[in-house]
């Protein structure tokens, strides 16, 4: 196994990415995937690497969110199976189709979602409950997350908050489900590719595991309005940046 010279830096990237993801419920996969892609790692290997690390970081994060009671059991169950199925299908497709063909549509969706989230803060609209749309959301998010190497939290968390779910439960539940989605995606890609950058996986998960408990504590103490605003801003920036990058 070849150890990349960027490993020490990737530990810091893993810490920062998980801190953002644990506090705001998004950003880990996207941030880590962007770095690996910049380093020239192929999309399928990038997705496998990030999801392998995410199995550990999401596991620690899920336990932390459960401790602080940030998980909504009903929403968790509605997202779980569809999310796993979507992840497996997306991983299978990624092994044969370039990811860049679908990324522009993902970024456009995120831009629209961010505006919905921010409008709820400004207009103070009445919260909505996540009902039958939960399974569809999980399936779509799991599929796109596998294709792009990340994005589950960005799609699921922002959509749930846009529908009126309290940020702490949207973030905690999203982090809990991604553990299973990441595991399914990682195993699917590993079985089809037969290779993975274990040195990068280790670097990302060391940094991420250290940040997870801190992020869960912050989530349970941040006011709902502030957390919602943060989610909207982060999604807008990620969406705008990603769309601009893919179209230029």
Give the label of every model feature segment.
Residues 1-22, 27, 31-43, 64-151, ...:
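Juxtamembrane transmembrane-helix boundary motif
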Residues 13, 23, 56-58, 180:
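Accessory recognition modules or surfaces
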Residues 49-64:
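Transmembrane alpha-helices of multi-pass small-molecule transport proteins
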Residues 50-54, 174-178, 200-201, 205:
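Short hydrophobic/aromatic, small-residue-rich stretches within specific transmembrane helices
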Residues 54-55, 119-124, 179-181:
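Short acidic/polar alpha-helix capping motifs at helix-coil junctions
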Residues 169-188:
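Hydrophobic alpha-helical transmembrane segments of multi-pass integral membrane proteins
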